[in-house]
């Protein structure tokens, strides 16, 4: 990124959003599709953070809503002037998940919440990502409904 004049945080974010190419580096063997994780996004955004003299901080907290627990992930982009842009995303912890203990369930919800906070901050569209739309064979055909 050329430094002709000082750019504000929104211009830096726009540069990052325009130049970020986050590949779908993970494979879901069950559904046989590729998807991107928070780690994939972080790996590709780091050089752009360096180029724009920005930093990224991601944090989690647990929110109780009714009898359910949600992980709230916050992604904050900060520049050298300490100007910030912040995005928050939530993921609900499953009540139980086969083969997972409580810590793994929370970790899984944290990963999803972080991914979606990063998606929001960096304008990554996952609507074509099977991880966001896969029903794992539970979809209903139109003729089944009629």
Feature-to-residue mapping (PLM):
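Polyanion-binding surfaces on beta-sheet-dominated domains and ring/shell assemblies
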Residues: 1-146
